[in-house]
Amino acid sequence: MHMADALISPAVGGAMWAVSGGLIAVCARKVKQTMRDNLVPMMGVLGAFIFAAQMINFSIPGTGSSGHLGGGLLLTVLLGPYAAFLVIASVLTVQAFFFADGGLLALGCNIFNLGFFPAFVAYPLVYRMVAGGRGGAFRNWAAALGAAVAGLLLGALGVVLETLASGISRTTPSAQI
């Protein structure tokens, strides 16, 4: 789900920009070190697909946020976590700048919530443990389902924690916001 700028304070937004920027730098370095011939074209094609799929938004009433299909886990399974994080960061940046999906202040939060949790938590701790390289259609299906649910729930938890850290809630009187 994309966070709107109204959900976070400038301090939290700035901190998450710094965290996400640091992750982008680390991922770019890792991708450069392990570059394969077909990686960049795959990143481009899959990025375009995820961009189109994520443009189908579902409004979340009363929050100013929207939810959509999450492409982070699919990218991670197909590209690996470092390349996937770079692609999802690129997709989210284009969506924020050109389509006002999310907000510029919240872009760091959105990159972290939609990129970090699927690529670096759900994929290694759920998908790889369940699928385990042993194959089998049911095992892969169960691993993908479990990791997708974990990634989405962790992303939603990230939104809650970032909003809480900002001191913005529905119970806050509007004069204080």
Regions found by a protein language model. Name each.
Residues 2-10, 14-75:
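Hydrophobic transmembrane alpha-helices
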Residues 2-9, 31, 35, 39, ...:
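Membrane-helix interfacial "entry" motifs
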Residues 3, 8-17, 21-22, 28, ...:
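Alpha-helical transmembrane segments and their immediate juxtamembrane flanks
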Residues 14-15, 40-45, 70, 85-89, ...:
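Hydrophobic alpha-helical transmembrane segments
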Residues 25-32, 53, 58, 95, ...:
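Membrane-water interface at transmembrane helix exits
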Residues 54, 58-118:
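Alpha-helical membrane segments and adjacent membrane-interface helices in multi-pass membrane proteins
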Residues 114-159:
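Short helix-perturbing small/polar motifs within transmembrane alpha-helices
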Residues 148-177:
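A structural signal for small-residue-enriched, beta-sheet-centric alpha/beta enzyme cores
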